[in-house]
């Protein structure tokens, strides 16, 4: 009888342990990407362009022989492409292009908020478009004095567009672009 009680207890304990060992898979929490970029220090663009502005000092200038430099962010693998055009009765077509270009990203974008920029004392007017979503370009802008000068810029990352991953870098570059817009001066 003692053996039967012991066997029953052993069998019951074994069954409970075997049934209790089935572990439920818990989803792992998603890690947040922590990117840290240096505090920006700004310096003046070379004196060979029809404009002046300040840019982040760890940015590399590319295509200096062009009418506007491209700003390459090596730590982010991103480039802010700049294009300058002298106005010759073509401001309507340039403004049309500047407003249509962000619209081409609407297929992948969730929204494209725009911020109007005006500095009448410096004759600088423009718009900054922030593309929210998995679009190829996360940021576009233009600046003009509406009579002689027109500057456009587009930000591209050298990676597959994944907004959640590149958002911290895009926000960092956006602050640099706002600083560029605020410090831009046309040369006459």
Give the location of each predicted region:
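Surface-exposed amphipathic alpha-helical segments
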Residues: 59, 154-188
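Signature of long, low-cysteine stretches enriched in small and polar/charged residues
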Residues: 60, 99-154
């Amino acid at each position: 009888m003692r053996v039967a009680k012991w066997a029953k207890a052993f069998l019951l304990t074994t069954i409970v342990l075997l049934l209790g060992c089935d572990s439920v898979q818990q989803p792992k929490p998603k890690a947040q990407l922590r990117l840290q970029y240096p505090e920006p220090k700004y310096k003046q663009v070379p004196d060979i362009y029809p404009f002046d502005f300040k840019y982040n000092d760890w940015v590399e200038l590319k295509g200096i022989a062009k009418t506007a430099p491209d700003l390459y962010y090596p730590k982010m693998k991103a480039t802010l492409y700049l294009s300058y055009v002298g106005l010759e009765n073509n401001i309507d077509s340039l403004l049309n292009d500047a407003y249509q270009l962000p619209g081409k990203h609407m297929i992948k974008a969730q929204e494209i908020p725009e911020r109007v920029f005006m500095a009448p004392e410096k004759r600088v007017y423009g718009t900054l478009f922030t593309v929210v979503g998995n679009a190829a370009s996360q940021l576009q802008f233009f600046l003009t004095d509406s009579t002689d000068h027109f500057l456009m810029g587009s930000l591209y990352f050298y990676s597959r567009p994944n907004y959640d991953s590149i958002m911290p870098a895009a926000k960092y570059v956006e602050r640099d672009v706002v600083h560029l817009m605020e410090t831009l001066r046309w040369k006459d």
